[in-house]
Amino acid sequence: MNHIRNFSIIAHIDHGKSTLADRLIQRCGGLADRDMEAQVLDSMDIEKERGITIKAQTAALQYKAKDGQVYNLNLIDTPGHVDFSYEVSRSLSACEGALLVVDASQGVEAQTVANCYTALELGVEVTAVLNKMDLPQADPENARAEIEDVIGIDASDAIPCSAKTGMGIEEILEAVVAKVPPPKGDPNGQLRAMIIDSWFDTYVGVVMLVRVVDGELKRGERFKMMASGAAYEANNLGVFTPADVPRDVLRAGEVGYIIAGIKELKAAKVGDTITLEKKLPNNLGPATEALPGFKEIKPQVFAGLYPTEASEYDQLRDALEKLQLNDSSLQFEPEVSQALGFGFRCGFLGLLHMEIVQERLEREFDQDLITTAPSVVYEVVKGDGEVIQVENPSKMPDAGRIEEVREPIVTVHLYMPQDYVGPVMTLANQKRGVQINMQYHGRQVMLTYEMPLGEIVLDFFDKLKSVSRGYASMDYEFKEYRASDVVKVDILLNGEKVDALSIIVHRSQATYRGRAVVAKMREIISRQMFDVAIQAAIGANIIARETVKAMRKNVLAKCYGGDITRKRKLLEKQKAGKKRMKQIGSVEVPQEAFLAILQVED
């Protein structure tokens, strides 16, 4: 036990934690040099392409320290993006120590702070590391000052390193051995292990990544999940060094995998405790108390996902279920839309999470999807005092039956160099933000705002990056529901409501957003044989209208000269025909129309 160290790496996006992990693995000989590729732990293609870590991955490394002892280091890589903060808290709860990696040329950024606080709350020992020291613009003194100033941990002995050139890697490993406490737990007690992650493998079923806290699990023993009571046999055990290495037993303090022929991802709930099924002569029997898990994560952003072909509904459901296996925060339920048919209402942690899920469905499962505009959950107090949660604009009751609508307010922390404070404040005010606080840390400024989540969901992050030339970073946490004057804007095509295009916006922006959506729709809907009226309405009030003019044949082409009445007769006849068509004709709404709502510029 004393020679085991469990640690993870926390950092803001692009501060180089995956590269650092590569170097640590290489130094400890976890992979042969020829298997060593950039970002070994980012195993999904989409992680490599976007250069972000989404799933937590692990590597068990053997390190011979300067004191001559061999230590087992379990490295758990964590994502840095705010949407995946639950992955971070999960990884950290399995560790005793964390390396806080800060880019020496950029200093502390928003998610670094958020993840670092998570670590400190969980009582993890945090060691600061200054990465990218090989860059000419690296400024270690400033970065140290910022770490002490913003996060409040001692950075005087922060380790300078460069994951690219390999400088400082030895020092980091020595620091892990010296500073990170060995795992607490009873190696001779009853088995208790926590599921840190689970994913589905087509050959062996569900693979569970566990951290053994007390006792040990041998191959072939039967174990049970404490939450559900379901029991399985441990067919295979092992550890990842990122490559998988089978073992006969997993002991207290180790992080490894269990394969037990489980078919359902739902059975292996992340955060659940595993213990032995029953008392046998050769074991200690089941534990009575489960380990404290982590809190269930609540989705913040909702959107509808629909298959382009109605017949692919079942495949989409299978795909979502498989994704949910290793992305426990994705939630979905079936829903029906008049415009789009059968599909699912999905809950995500944030916008990036939504994009990733969509992209994984398209790539890994070959799904063609239509996505509706993302919306957040509103609390609606009805006239009779009943409070309901509305996460889909089409479920919003009529204005007459509503007493008040409350929208979710979040506290947003924005970090940026002081040159960009002006534009960022303007942006935050446009989004109905209320400034709570402003602090200067050296050249960096931290602004704290309270803002409606609904404003952030659409495009706040992209706008923030563009007004600050990519320097600003943000993270947010939910604060409360507050009464607000929000209304539902419906889009009508030839007088018919298209439920999937409804949006919920603040009354002050309703007219503007309505006009913008309608104008955008006009460009997208192709011309028909009859006029198409596109309207935006609040209740029965029409607030904007555009018309897509009909295509028509030149019916007068065959008249040479001749009387005006003859021409008029032909035109009237054409008009009557168009009118008849309009009554029975239906308008196809192309996929772009649903995306148009997302791209309405402010």
Curated annotation (Swiss-Prot):
Its main location: membrane. GO terms for cellular component: plasma membrane. Keywords: Cell inner membrane, Cell membrane, GTP-binding, Hydrolase, Membrane, Nucleotide-binding, Protein biosynthesis. Residues 2-184 form the tr-type G domain. It is an enzyme of class 3 (hydrolase). GTP binds at residues 14-19, 131-134. Its EC number is 3.6.5.n1. It catalyses: GTP + H2O = GDP + phosphate + H(+). GO terms for molecular function: GTP binding; GTPase activity; guanosine tetraphosphate binding; ribosome binding; translation elongation factor activity. It is found in: Cell inner membrane. It is a peripheral membrane protein. CDD domains: EF4_III, LepA, lepA_C. GO terms for biological process: positive regulation of translation. PROSITE patterns: G_TR_1, G_TR_2. Pfam families: EFG_C, GTP_EFTU, GTP_EFTU_D2, LepA_C. InterPro entries: EF-4, EFG_III/V, EFG_V-like, EFTu-like_2, G_TR_CS, LepA_C_sf, LepA_CTD, LepA_IV. PANTHER family: TRANSLATION FACTOR GUF1 HOMOLOG, CHLOROPLASTIC (PTHR43512:SF4), TRANSLATION FACTOR GUF1-RELATED (PTHR43512). Required for accurate and efficient protein synthesis under certain stress conditions. May act as a fidelity factor of the translation reaction, by catalyzing a one-codon backward translocation of tRNAs on improperly translocated ribosomes. Back-translocation proceeds from a post-translocation (POST) complex to a pre-translocation (PRE) complex, thus giving elongation factor G a second chance to translocate the tRNAs correctly. Binds to ribosomes in a GTP-dependent manner. Belongs to the TRAFAC class translation factor GTPase superfamily. Classic translation factor GTPase family. LepA subfamily. This is Elongation factor 4. The gene is lepA.
